[in-house]
UniProtKB/Swiss-Prot annotation:
Transfers the gamma-phosphate of ATP to the 4'-position of a tetraacyldisaccharide 1-phosphate intermediate (termed DS-1-P) to form tetraacyldisaccharide 1,4'-bis-phosphate (lipid IVA). The lineage of its organism: Bacteria, Pseudomonadati, Pseudomonadota, Betaproteobacteria, Burkholderiales. It catalyses: a lipid A disaccharide + ATP = a lipid IVA + ADP + H(+). Transmembrane segments: none annotated. This is Tetraacyldisaccharide 4'-kinase. Pfam families: LpxK (PF02606). It comes from the Bacteria. NCBIfam families: lpxK (TIGR00682). The gene is lpxK. ATP binds at T68, V69, G70, G71, T72, G73, K74, T75. Belongs to the LpxK family.
Length: 342
């Protein structure tokens, strides 16, 4: 049984379901999708043909993004990629748009930054990797500011920004979840920002159901595994997920694909009631105050907006680790080193 989600979350879930099939709504929206596709194609062509100039910031950029709307697992992928690049001998930094943050100029994000000023994903990345992280809607400005502040950085990972064509990049990685391209239609008739045929260097598929990978070139499985939960008010307290099995548990997530979080918990032996909150939910007030559960499990991305000052002793945070295929890491490293030696 699921706890009742908010109106906005239900509307998002309904639209997501519609995007998985070619129903009446999808077909009715195809004229708008055609217009969207034409505009997007013109933007891509403008940079591909040199009508508009790409900006090389003097440091190779690896873009981790998606061609679909909604969460696919980019943030844990960025964290894992930063760790892998560091292990390969690079000194990585990260740039992001800082969704929801009040930013107009390039801004550094540290583990102590406020989520309202940094954005939840950049703050989580800064805390998990301790790498230099800068945010700005203008990715070029963000990369330049990061490089000026940290000249030792020799590769920049862009958290999203696939459609920010102005920024020159050395590697593009597109991340999908189990829904892949949905009904195959462009926005607003479907979930696609760009056609599935869009060129990229590698594809990651984050499918908790472990189905066969699509037959695309350089496609790799992305595995997300949960770690022990930690207590929001007392982070030093740890608890294996299996120990929640006999408790009344609510799982809540304000991320792009909350069902993926719920599926991860079920696979670990937890059978929670579920609440899908709107993506980037602000947690201005405690949405759990009237809920009667022994424990409430939330994502790390949501936890950065709460802090340890929240007095709800039922809240536990479930961290997620991404396991990257060694062949993907080798592909990225080869392209980066080839660019450096060119």
């Amino acid at each position: 049984m699921s706890a009742r989600p908010g109106l906005l979350a239900r509307a998002e879930a309904r639209l997501t379901r519609e995007w998985q099939r070619r129903g009446a709504l999808a077909w009715a929206l195809t004229p708008f999708a055609c217009a969207f596709g034409a505009i997007a194609a013109l933007r891509r062509a403008a940079y591909a043909r040199g009508w508009k100039a790409r900006v090389d910031c003097g440091v190779p950029v690896v873009v981790v993004g998606n061609v679909t709307v909604g969460g696919t697992g980019k943030t844990p992928t960025v964290i894992a990629l930063v760790d892998a690049l560091r292990a390969a001998g690079f000194t990585p930094g990260v740039v992001s748009r800082g969704y929801g943050a009040k930013i107009v100029a390039p801004t550094a994000v540290t583990p102590a930054s406020a989520p309202q000023q940094a954005g939840d994903e950049p703050l989580l990345i800064a805390r998990r990797t301790l790498a230099p992280v800068w945010v700005c809607p203008d990715r070029v400005a963000a990369v330049r500011a990061l490089k000026a502040a940290h000249p030792e950085v020799d590769v920049v990972v862009s958290d999203d920004g696939l459609q920010h064509y102005r920024l020159a990049r050395a590697v593009e990685i597109v991340v999908f979840d189990h829904r892949l391209g949905g009904n195959g239609f462009l926005l607003p008739a479907g979930p696609l920002r760009e056609p599935l045929s869009r060129r990229r260097d590698a594809t990651l598929v984050n499918d908790p159901y472990s189905r066969a990978l699509p037959p695309w070139p350089d496609t790799f499985a992305l595995s997300l595994a949960p770690g022990d939960a930690w207590h929001l008010a007392r982070p030093s307290r740890r608890k294996p997920l299996a120990q929640f099995a006999g408790e009344r548990v609510l799982a809540a997530a304000g991320i792009g694909a909350p069902e993926r979080f719920f599926a991860t918990l079920r696979a670990a032996g937890v059978t929670p009631a579920t609440r899908a909150l709107p993506d980037h939910y602000a947690f201005a007030t405690n949405p759990f105050v009237d809920d009667h559960f022994d424990a409430i499990l939330i994502t790390e991305k949501d936890a950065v907006k709460l802090g340890t000052s929240w007095r709800d002793a039922r809240i536990w945070v479930v961290p997620v680790e991404a396991a990257l295929d060694p062949r993907l890491i080798a592909l990225v490293v080869e392209k980066l080193r080839g660019r450096t030696s060119a």
